[in-house]
């Protein structure tokens, strides 16, 4: 017995000496939030003569102590080494806060999107997301046909088109759905609406590839309850509501919660979460498309430091999925940057168009005002009666004004239900730029 006590004391003293080593503590602190492949970690300079395998486990232990879910929250029937956890590093929280500040309802981007969401360049982002989700579900629709169904609201002619028309209708009421309690009944309603009149549609889903390391997931009978819990309490899975929305999305992607149309259901649930937690602008960030590109190895360092399926750190303390969450946050940030650039460019083009319109001396003030309105709302369709009432002029004058705008190549026209209607040319910016260039005298330089 005395020998055992002596051995225990010696072991404790040795362990404390190791843990109190300043160089070792510095190494652990530097690597706690710096995720590397195990092989790369083993090549790092170690403190003193420390064993790299021991340092790998020590760093993993520190991460596990800060990880979620806690050991108490996990299934005790599974050994710790088989359990999955994640952390939210300070850099991740700062990144999430920055994303929220740029995409919340009061942000300039969100206010601009309220005016510009019907512009083709903005709609393209939503179409990319729908195409990626459709690909995942084994439903392929040509891009132009999808655009007509979603953007032009053309009546669907096939079961595939009907599916996307149903998705469009759900998207139109997504903000309203976000104000309702999220429960299994709401999920069932959304799935039923999405699948309406698609019984004849045969699909072969293309699920996400399995990661190289097996990641525990909730039992199938608990999966929907887990998703509901994460949507009802966005901070359940971490210290930030947007982090929780990403965890929920990954749960649906990796462990399909729906036998049919899992990809589109994930998209709808995530977009609903964006509205519920106050980041509506993020629905124009095609996260599904970026994740799909990552799976296909179409993106790599520096945009994706780790390969898809390998963004996991495995130790005797469990499977740490933090690198995966870091990648999703990076994708959101990168997608938001792209969205901001597109919005800024769209606004710049609109202002340039209106400037050129008001500089055109061939146009009356009425015509200039109408064209400016159409630039701000390209989906607006006018007829002679509307123009007549707007400017309080005779019908003959209204018709002459509109016909003149057609002849000048500003408007397009057709007869619909025995009424002539007019709308802005889709390529109006190109038409105006060409006309401006043609009317500007060529500059000359003197040798």
Feature map (PLM): residue ranges:
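N-terminal structured helix/loop subdomain that forms the ligand-binding/catalytic interface
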Residues: 1-196, 435, 445-447
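Phosphate/pyrophosphate-binding active-site loops
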Residues: 2-76, 80, 213-343
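Residue-level detector of well-ordered alpha-helical segments, enriched
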Residues: 122, 126, 163-166, 186, ...
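Short alpha-helical scaffolding segments that buttress acidic/His motifs in well-ordered protein cores
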Residues: 130-131, 150, 190-194, 204-208, ...
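Short coil/turn segments at secondary-structure boundaries
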Residues: 142-147, 182-189, 201-212, 239-242, ...
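Short, conserved phosphate-binding/catalytic loop or strand-edge motifs used
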Residues: 143-153, 164-171, 206-211, 223-224, ...
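Solvent-exposed, amphipathic alpha-helical segments
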Residues: 148-152, 166-177, 223-233, 307, ...
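C-terminal regulatory or interaction extensions
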Residues: 249-257, 263-397, 401-447
């Amino acid at each position: 017995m005395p020998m055992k006590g002596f051995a225990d004391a010696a072991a404790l003293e040795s362990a404390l000496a190791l843990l109190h080593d300043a160089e070792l503590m510095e190494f652990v602190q530097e690597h706690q939030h710096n995720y590397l492949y195990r092989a790369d970690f083993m090549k790092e300079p170690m403190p003193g003569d420390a064993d790299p395998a021991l340092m790998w486990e020590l760093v993993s232990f520190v991460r596990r102590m800060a990880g979620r879910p806690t050991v108490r929250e996990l299934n005790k029937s599974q050994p710790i080494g088989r359990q999955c956890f994640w952390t939210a590093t300070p850099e991740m929280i700062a990144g999430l806060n920055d994303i929220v500040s740029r995409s919340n309802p009061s942000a300039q981007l969100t206010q601009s999107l309220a005016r510009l969401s019907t512009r083709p360049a903005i709609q393209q982002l939503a179409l990319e997301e729908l195409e990626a989700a459709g690909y995942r579900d084994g439903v392929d629709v040509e891009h132009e046909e999808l655009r007509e169904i979603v953007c032009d609201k053309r009546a669907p002619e096939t079961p595939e088109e009907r599916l996307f028309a149903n998705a469009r209708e759900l998207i139109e009421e997504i903000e309203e759905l976000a104000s309702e309690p999220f429960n299994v009944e709401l999920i069932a309603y959304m799935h039923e609406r999405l699948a309406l009149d698609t019984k004849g549609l045969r699909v072969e889903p293309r699920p996400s590839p399995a990661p190289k390391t097996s990641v525990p997931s909730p039992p199938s009978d608990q999966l929907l309850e887990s998703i509901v819990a994460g949507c009802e309490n966005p901070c359940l899975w971490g210290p930030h509501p947007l982090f929780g929305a990403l965890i929920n999305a990954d749960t649906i992607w990796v462990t399909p919660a729906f036998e049919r149309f899992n990809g589109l259901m994930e998209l709808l649930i995530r977009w609903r979460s964006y509205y519920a937690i106050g980041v509506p602008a993020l629905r124009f960030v095609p996260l599904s498309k970026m994740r799909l590109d990552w799976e296909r190895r179409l993106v790599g360092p520096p945009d994706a430091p780790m390969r898809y399926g390998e963004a996991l750190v495995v130790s005797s303390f469990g499977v740490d999925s933090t690198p995966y969450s870091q990648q999703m946050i990076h994708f959101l940030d990168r997608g938001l940057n792209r969205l901001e650039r597109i919005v800024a460019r769209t606004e710049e083009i609109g202002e340039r168009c209106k400037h050129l319109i008001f500089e055109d001396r061939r146009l009356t003030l009425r015509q200039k005002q109408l064209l400016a309105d159409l630039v701000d709302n390209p989906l607006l369709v006018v007829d002679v009666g509307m123009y007549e009432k707007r400017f309080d002029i005779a019908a003959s004058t209204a018709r002459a004004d509109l016909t003149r705008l057609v002849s000048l190549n500003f408007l397009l026209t057709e007869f619909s239900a025995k009424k002539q209607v007019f709308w802005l040319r889709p390529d109006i910016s190109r038409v105006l730029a060409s006309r401006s260039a043609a009317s500007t005298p060529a500059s000359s330089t003197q040798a």
